[in-house]
């Protein structure tokens, strides 16, 4: 790179001094500088920054016009300025002396040739780039995850707080507000539910007789320390039934009692007669077949069954050894 810079800058100088007599000397100086620059360029690969540190910008020293003959002076050292002025015939030294070569001008200005600054080689390491990209990605993801985690924790805390408050409010409301029946339930289910809700307390498993009710009252009068729950377990009824019996003002009447006793006796006799009739019918229907005591419908059906059986080939009611059975000719 440094050799290319020297060559480009010196080519411009050679273009200016192509009609001068010292063209050969410039060519020699170019060869010297090119050899020195090639040797120095082999030691260090990056030389753009080194050439900038030497305060000599060979690429940007001159700016040429369209025809390439005239150049503008931009930034040059004093030695190079004098050289260019002597070559172009503008300065005090109008070829009065032998013009200095570029190598001599550089030696005068710097004492020695500008040494290249050693800079670290910029080599593209794919592994390091991938590592840096990975670290940057992990840092970015960690940052995003941290922010998301913080936001998630804040959101969860907020939601938990709101849910806690909502649960507390729900508990308080459910404790006070009664539960309404579901609209989708049919009317007969609602009716049963309402009846159970109304009459759940008054739901005795059996009805007590008047004698039992009198006994219950006597027990409570003689033993007041008995509780309603204990009396309900003793008579096998609900506690509410015991409470209503004790609170009622019913008093048994002798006339009513005689009437009730007579009615019960009649019901008992009727029930016994029905049981005896059922027994007689069962005994009468249990007789042999084709008996006159059997119903008429059964007498008409029995001969038909016998005719069907006798119509079969080799019909016999039973079978015996060494005889045909069922027309199959098998002998047993």
From Swiss-Prot:
- The reply to whether Thylakoid figures as a keyword in the UniProt entry is no
Q: Which GO terms describe its cellular component?
A: mitochondrion; nucleus
Chief site of localization? mitochondrion
Positions with biased composition (Low complexity): 37-55, 130-166, 293-306
- One Pfam family in the UniProt entry: Neugrin
Outline the segment boundaries, as ranges, of region: Disordered. Answer: 37-70, 126-166, 285-316
Which superkingdom is the protein from?
Eukaryota
Keywords associated with the record: Mitochondrion, Transit peptide
According to its UniProt record, where is this protein located?
Answer: Mitochondrion
Q: Which family does it belong to?
A: Belongs to the RRG9 family.
PANTHER family documented for this protein: NEUGRIN (PTHR13475:SF3)
- Sum up the protein's function in the record's words: Required for respiratory activity and maintenance and expression of the mitochondrial genome.
Instruction: Specify the protein name.
Output: Required for respiratory growth protein 9, mitochondrial
Q: Which gene encodes it?
A: RRG9
């Amino acid at each position: 790179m440094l050799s290319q810079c020297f060559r480009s800058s010196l080519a411009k100088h050679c273009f200016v001094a192509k009609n001068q007599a010292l063209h050969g000397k410039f060519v020699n100086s170019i060869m010297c500088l090119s050899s020195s620059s090639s040797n120095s360029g082999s030691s260090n690969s990056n030389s753009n920054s080194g050439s900038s540190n030497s305060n000599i910008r060979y690429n940007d020293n001159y700016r040429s016009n369209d025809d390439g003959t005239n150049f503008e002076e931009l930034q040059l050292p004093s030695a190079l300025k004098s050289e260019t002025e002597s070559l172009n015939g503008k300065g005090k030294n109008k070829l009065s002396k032998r013009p200095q070569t570029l190598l001599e001008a550089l030696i005068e200005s710097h004492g020695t040739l500008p040494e290249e600054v050693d800079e670290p080689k910029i080599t593209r390491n794919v592994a390091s780039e991938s590592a840096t990209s990975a670290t940057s990605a992990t840092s970015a993801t960690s940052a995003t995850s941290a922010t998301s985690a913080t936001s998630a924790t804040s959101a969860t805390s907020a939601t938990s707080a709101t849910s806690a408050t909502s649960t507390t409010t729900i508990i308080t409301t459910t404790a006070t507000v009664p539960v309404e029946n579901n609209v989708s339930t049919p009317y007969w289910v609602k009716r049963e539910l309402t009846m159970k809700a109304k009459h759940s307390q008054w739901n005795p498993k059996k009805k007590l007789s008047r004698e039992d009710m009198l006994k219950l009252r006597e027990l409570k009068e003689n033993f007041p320390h008995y509780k309603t729950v204990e009396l309900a377990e003793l008579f096998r009824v609900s506690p509410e039934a015991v409470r209503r019996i004790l609170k009622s003002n019913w008093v048994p009447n002798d006339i009513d009692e005689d009437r009730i006793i007579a009615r019960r006796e009649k019901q008992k006799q009727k029930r016994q007669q029905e049981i005896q009739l059922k027994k007689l019918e069962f005994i009468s229907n249990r007789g042999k077949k084709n008996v006159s005591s059997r119903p008429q419908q059964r007498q008409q059906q029995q001969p038909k069954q016998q005719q069907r059986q006798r119509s079969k080939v080799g019909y016999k009611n039973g079978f015996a050894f060494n005889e045909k059975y069922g027309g199959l000719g098998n002998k047993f």
